[in-house]
Swiss-Prot record:
Organism of derivation: Syntrophomonas wolfei subsp. wolfei (strain DSM 2245B / Goettingen)
Family per record: Belongs to the Thz kinase family.
GO molecular function: ATP binding; hydroxyethylthiazole kinase activity; magnesium ion binding
EC number(s) from the headed UniProt entry: 2.7.1.50
Binding-site list for ATP: K120, T166
Name this polypeptide is given: Hydroxyethylthiazole kinase
Reactions catalysed according to its record: 5-(2-hydroxyethyl)-4-methylthiazole + ATP = 4-methyl-5-(2-phosphooxyethyl)-thiazole + ADP + H(+)
SUPFAM superfamilies linked: Ribokinase-like
GN (gene name): thiM
Amino acid sequence: MLKYCAEIWDEVRNRRPLVHCITNYVTVNDVANIILAAGASPAMVEYPAEASGFAPLASVLYFNLGTLTGEQEAAMLEGRWAAASRDVPLILDPVACGVIGRKVDLIERIKSLGKIQVLKGNIAEIKSLAGLAGKAQGVDSLDTGEGLEEACLQLAVKDKLIAVATGEVDIVAEENRYARIFNGTPLFQNITGAGCMAGGVIAACVGAAPEEAWLASITGLLAFNLAGERAASQAGNRPGTFRTLLFDELFVLRGEELMKEGRLEW
């Protein structure tokens, strides 16, 4: 599997997919820059009238519900509707959906307009959408992760999508299969927006290989986590330094290194 992940990672730079992002204002700059570091091209188009015209031109859509405004909500609905006829894949991060019911309603409305290819969240968010009890404090998960594989598979089957759960060990599931990703670093917990950035890198990979969305999702998360590991080894216990190095390490990461250093189980 690592061989295929390496090929997809290098393909991102070859294809330079256009990633249409509607994301939260806390992390929008970091998301744009991490997508650039991955080798893709970000476009932060949020005005509804513009989103409906732009979304069909994109390689992939990335919607993040972190600081959801009425204008963003309208843009997501317009964009998903307009892009559905072109089969543009959608990656959705349902930030805090377990504690803000309005976001669950929006997810259902988006699903009614077009398929969600990948749904990426923390443990509490994934369990909540799978119909299980998850513990959350605001946007952060307090869940231990017990039963996470089953929750991801349940959500993947229920909504016919790829479920990505981030935690101490990350899970990427579709229908009757899943992979565990063991790369990563605790320093991700000390910066704002690690999950948002991970979603952006996943979107870049799915945009480059939409026909292999499960492998592309694994590739994006694996690359982001490995870049984090490498950054942490140089940063010590300094989150500001770590954040800067994260962009640098992702930018220089190549498929051959991903194949050698990636730690997967499937």
